[in-house]
């Protein structure tokens, strides 16, 4: 199954996590706001609070190993 990272968990990002989880994708969600990250935890394999504008942060998460990265800002 594909590994997908979703950056930005506003309404669109939240619903992406929910829908893609229903289809069995392996998901990682990233946002700066802890409350948004906590809301998607039931739908994702990994939920991370952090600044996705920071290249080093993304590299530490292994972003290059994902099949798809969706930016929802």
Where are these regions (language model features)?
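Cytosolic regulatory regions of ion transport systems
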Residues: 1-73
């Amino acid at each position: 199954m594909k590994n997908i990272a979703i950056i930005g968990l506003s309404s669109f990002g939240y619903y992406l996590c929910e829908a893609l989880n229903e289809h069995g994708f392996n998901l990682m969600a990233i946002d700066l706001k802890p409350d948004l990250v906590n809301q998607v935890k039931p739908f994702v394999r990994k939920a991370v609070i952090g600044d996705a504008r920071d290249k080093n942060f993304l590299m530490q998460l292994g972003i290059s190993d994902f099949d798809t990265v969706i930016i929802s800002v």
